[in-house]
Amino acid sequence: MAGQAPTAVPGSVTGEVSRWQNLGPAQPAQKVAQPQNLVPDGHLEKALEGSDLLQKLGGFHIAIAFAHLAFGGYLISTVKNLHLVVLKCWYPLWGTVSFLVAGMAAMTTVTFPKTSLKVLCVIANVISLFCALAGFFVIAKDLFLEGPFPWPIWRPYPEPTTYIQRLELTLFCFTFLEIFLSGSTAITAYRMKRLQAEDKDDTPFVPDTPMELKGLSLGPPPSYKDVAQGHSSSDTGRALATSSGLLLASDSFHQALLHTGPRTLRK
């Protein structure tokens, strides 16, 4: 009885063993590179400086537009019989509109830095530049060429038309300033658009530190032969463990029988 070994052992004795156990040496952890990140450079600082400058230029545009509207409206309301080319062509009206649109386009470009808005800002400021040049020549014609006003402007005993002449001279100064503002704003918006295009094309890429995936293998799955060998080796281990337990139990039973045998014979 002690020499016999069981030939079949039920699987509920030692529990279910994993199929993937003992398939070979453990594979090292796989390293996976994370997505690449952009590296900031000097283009970002230049873009921020350009945005601040563009915002200030837009504010100056809007301020000059309202001042131009105030002085132009007062000039229209006071002039009655005096022939002025600047009023015949309604320059105070369309000049104010062009300056205001250019300033609002610059402020909108700073708030929403999109390529389409930057192009619109450049176009609006170029149109404002041509409007300012046209107004500059119109006012210069009234002040210096046709000569409806007495000269010089600043005289100790001004005539009734002198204050009108001074109002038009104020519009002339605003228009002269608007020429430089429109040109500067158009150039700044164009440079911002160019910097954004260079940023998209020339930004270097640096990969992040590889990330380790512990306990996971990215290699091919094991073959059917390896899985079958692992399963048979686990079944053999279970059978050996069970047979060892049965052998120990039979030995203990045999020893107990030997100890109790003489007692039974004495009785």
Swiss-Prot record:
Tissue: Expressed in thymus, kidney, colon, brain and testis. Expressed also by various hematopoietic and lymphoblastoid cell lines.
Membrane topology classification: Multi-pass membrane protein
Gene Ontology cellular-component annotations: membrane
InterPro entries: CD20-like (IPR007237)
Transmembrane regions listed in the UniProt entry: 57-77, 84-104, 119-139, 169-189
Extracellular-side positions: 78-83, 140-168
Localization: Membrane
Cytoplasmic topological domain: 1-56, 105-118, 190-267
Pfam families: CD20
Keywords: Membrane, Receptor, Transmembrane, Transmembrane helix
Family: Belongs to the MS4A family.
Function: May be involved in signal transduction as a component of a multimeric receptor complex.
Protein name: Membrane-spanning 4-domains subfamily A member 10
Name of the gene encoding the protein in the UniProt record: Ms4a10
